[in-house]
From Swiss-Prot:
Protein role: Required for the insertion and/or proper folding and/or complex formation of integral membrane proteins into the membrane. Involved in integration of membrane proteins that insert both dependently and independently of the Sec translocase complex, as well as at least some lipoproteins. Aids folding of multispanning membrane proteins.
NCBIfam families cross-referenced by the UniProt entry: PRK01318.1-3 (NF002352), PRK01318.1-4 (NF002353), yidC_nterm (TIGR03593), yidC_oxa1_cterm (TIGR03592)
Family classification: Belongs to the OXA1/ALB3/YidC family. Type 1 subfamily.
Membrane topology: Multi-pass membrane protein
BP-aspect Gene Ontology terms: protein insertion into membrane; protein transport
One Pfam family here: YidC_periplas
Gene Ontology MF terms in the entry: membrane insertase activity
GO cellular component: plasma membrane
HAMAP family, sorted: YidC_type1
This protein's name: Membrane protein insertase YidC
Alphabetical UniProt keywords: Cell inner membrane, Cell membrane, Chaperone, Membrane, Protein transport, Transmembrane, Transmembrane helix, Transport
Assembly: Interacts with the Sec translocase complex via SecD. Specifically interacts with transmembrane segments of nascent integral membrane proteins during membrane integration.
Transmembrane stretches, start-end: 6-26, 328-348, 351-371, 425-445, 459-479, 499-519
Amino acid sequence: MDTRRLILVLIFTFSSFMLWENWQKYNQPKPADAVAAAPVSGAAPTPSAALQAKAAPGTPPVATPVSTAETFSITTDLLKATISAQGGDLVSLELLNYKEHDDIQKNFDLFDAKHQYLAQAGLIGEGLPTHRTTFKHVGGATKLADGTDELKVRLESADQNGIKVAKILTFKRGSYLIDIAWEVANGSDKAIAPHAYYQLQRDDLAPAGETKMVSTFTGPAVFTDADKYQKVTFEHIADNKAKFTKTADNGWLAMVQHYFVSAWVPKDKTQREFYMRKVEGSNVFQAGVIVPVAEIAPGAKGEASVSLYAGPQMQSALKQVAPGLDLVVDYGWLTVVAAPIFWALEAIHKLVGNWGWAIVVLTIMIKAVFFPLSAASYKSMAKMKMLTPRLAQLKERFGDDKQRLNQEMMKLYQTEKVNPLGGCLPILVQIPVFIALYWVLLGAVEMRGAPWILWIKDLASADPYYILPVIMMVSMFVQTKLNPTPPDPIQAKVMMMMPLIFGFMFFWFPAGLVLYWVVNNVLSIAQQWQITRLIDAGGKAANDAKA
């Protein structure tokens, strides 16, 4: 296989990878065993008979419309949360350390009203408050004070049949975790056994900044110890074909999007039931978890609490929140390669303090690891380049006899001790590393808003002036000049077009990925030029000796 075929193989492999990833996203196979998810109107969910035990859920009360409900804000060192009096819903959650994709003057709002994205919670049981019930904020601070580590927000609903209910949200310093707790005081004359539900609501539209060239998964996901990480598409929920674990005594439920995640994390060994559903007549979906509250005798109090993580997909933080939560940073089928690459990138960043330079250093390290393979490849290419005139002569002599031409070419390769596959195999070995690095740079929230130098203000966004893609095209053009020229004029023209095709594709790729490619190309050019120069010098010396 000569150089032109090698490059064509690389292009075909990369293109196939991109097509496969997008095919998986839009054409996932139909699951055999589906969990029913009938359209709903936004009412409280109903637990299954197995989870209900003695509970008898009733009809939720009529709520104040969202448009007329009052709101108030809570501010910590990391968050600015807006809470609605209706249900005590989290209707806005600004992440103070992250900016909007299309307006860096604004904080990124995870619970974005444009996507009808919010976190809701309620109780299931006759007369008990749901996410449609009006609550009252019972005083207290709305800003985390200096020197304090947590801020509690207490909401109370109107008494129903002697039952008093309070919803307490606890915000913590330096954390994206919010504890959502229920206090139920049973002043009635009979025991009650309510359930608490916690759900995330969102439409099916991709977040701002997503393109088909660099699209990632958006939708709900479930994790349990038994069945591990399970992504569920909005399409499968809408078609009643969603497949996921429904009951367990461990695990969490999340709503995933590029760079960020919100997840309900009940306490371990608490029996729970996961559900997903489409709100009737809309493109809005709800995914949640139901947990039982212990039976509350007359005159007694009961409590239930679940943690909500709502923030960036920082792997180190996610691992501490719950087992498997770091899997929302999805590297696909190359996780075994991508995970150590990210670990190395993070370690380098701690030393150099800049993610752009960390990418440069990591590229040099990867190039050093593959140096022997690359050297073997470039030596083979250089020898093939020296044989180009003789191969052209053979083609001119035996062009009409393909079998004889191939025989003569193989004789030439054997005589000159050249392996035509030598330039291909070493580079093919590196393809999984490149694809894994692609997913690392695409999925790492650390790259979002991270500057490099001068005009590169965000390594997760495309180069605004297309300087890096142009440099990449130039570097690829130089590489084609260092490679053997195809004897076929048409193939030669195709090879000359490849830098333009690749460069055009990379106009929309994250700058961090293009930076890796540029640095890799520059190092490859230097290595290939040096090897070619040495081989040319050796060949010339051998010819002089023969003369």
